[in-house]
Amino acid sequence: MATTTPNYGWPVPTSTDYVKDGATAIEALGDAIDATVFGLPSAGLTLVKTQTIGSAVSSVTVTSAFSATYDAYKIIISGGASSSNTCVLQMTLGSTATGYRAAIWEVNYTAGSAVTGQNNTAFWNFGLGVPEGLSAIGDISLPFASDQTTFSSTAVAMGLAGGNMLTRWMNGFLGDTTSYTAFTITPSAGTLTGGTIKVYGYKA
């Protein structure tokens, strides 16, 4: 007599079932698995692109990052190093070099905190870089759609002189209706070596 699996209740034959009923048993099991998998939640992150940063580069362009498949993306920059003691990792979408706006909250563990802004600049402040590593974790919404693009990111500069640490939170938008597929990361000073840029798409 057929039994069922303990977790999903899929029908499976037992060792005493007739061999002649094997095809029917496999069909029933396949239908049950298909129904379960089809009903599983689809939300989550899917890796879209991994871009390795070269040696002593002045910018990194990530192509085929955005498409109609996803409305929102997570971008993570990690590893590697900056030749500058502290640099800002600036982001531009496509070839657009104007219209970027953002609010920036910065905490320096020895110098206190500050709030600044970007109004119609040539880039977003997206992350930070120091010789000890590159840092940025951010979300971008609607870069491919013909709508304004918004972003939110955080970054930490580790190992600054005297054991100091710098943290930034950045939020902003680009108020055009251009559809973008690529973005570029440029250090505000010096060059970048090593590390990766990973782009994930948010499933609906």
Describe each model-derived feature in a short phrase.
Residues 2-4, 17, 21, 30-204:
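Surface-exposed molecular-recognition determinants
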Residues 3-13:
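Short, contiguous pre-domain boundary segments
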Residues 26:
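Charged, flexible cofactor/metal-binding loops and thiol motifs
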